[in-house]
């Protein structure tokens, strides 16, 4: 079922596993195509590796270069749109915003049976139209349908320095994953390496009014993550450790 892979940037911890995954999919007999989205350098890195280790596969791997400097549509299908989020890191990097498309209303079968609604009218009713009976009675759409669940939005932001310019893009997201590589005591190191602290991640979440925050991408120097969790929780209660 995997059809799309989204790569943020060309640092090893974000892309070294890709050749092995593609090779494994080939060995498992995959035949459907696969699209890899990411900075244009991703194809430069992956093509020679695939030529060596992924020959003879029964499926095509396509590359979709993403402009890491702009907020733009990356891909969409019937149910989902994916947008790039320009991030601030040492090399070209982008996050991704995954936005569900609104779903059609749910038919209340008991009511459509009661009013003997023809099958040919169901599509229009799902899209919000009222139903007019052969006798001319107007049946409100609200009597025939239940609203679908609101569409959800998920933002993935890693790796990045503290970058308030992403706030309008992720405003109100249902879930934000934001890197939190360092604690505040290592703020200077965070600035030097273009990473964020846990507190900074929480400030972004708070000011963007997201519903939930997951932090991750911790430096290996922290054996105990409780300090990072406390710093984020102080700004954004309910922060989840990823």
Label every model-predicted segment:
Residues 67-215, 226-230, 235:
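Metal-dependent phosphodiesterase/nuclease catalytic metal-binding core
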Residues 1-37, 65-67:
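Active-site metal-binding motif and surrounding structural segment of the metallo-beta-lactamase
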């Amino acid at each position: 079922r995997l059809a799309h892979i989204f790569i943020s940037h060309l640092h090893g911890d974000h892309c070294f596993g890709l050749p092995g995954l593609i090779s494994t999919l080939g060995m498992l007999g995959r035949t459907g195509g696969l699209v890899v989205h990411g900075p244009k350098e991703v194809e430069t890195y992956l093509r020679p590796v695939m030529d060596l280790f992924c020959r003879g596969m029964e499926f095509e791997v396509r590359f979709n270069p993403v402009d890491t400097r702009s907020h733009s549509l990356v891909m969409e299908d019937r149910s989902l749109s994916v947008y790039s989020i320009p991030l601030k890191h040492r090399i070209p990097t982008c996050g991704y915003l995954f936005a569900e498309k609104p779903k059609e209303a749910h038919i209340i079968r008991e009511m459509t049976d009661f009013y003997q609604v023809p099958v040919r009218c169901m599509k229009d009713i799902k899209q919000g139209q009222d139903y007019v009976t052969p006798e001319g009675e107007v049946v409100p759409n609200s009597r025939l349908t239940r609203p679908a669940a609101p569409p959800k939005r998920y933002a993935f932001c890693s790796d990045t320095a503290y970058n308030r310019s992403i706030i309008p893009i992720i405003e109100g997201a249902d879930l934000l994953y934001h890197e939190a590589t360092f604690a505040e005591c290592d703020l200077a190191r965070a600035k030097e390496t273009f990473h964020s602290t846990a507190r900074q991640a929480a400030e972004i979440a708070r000011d963007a009014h997201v519903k939930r925050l997951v932090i991750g991408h911790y430096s290996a120097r922290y054996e105990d993550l409780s300090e990072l969790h406390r710093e984020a929780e102080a700004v954004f209660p309910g922060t989840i450790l990823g």
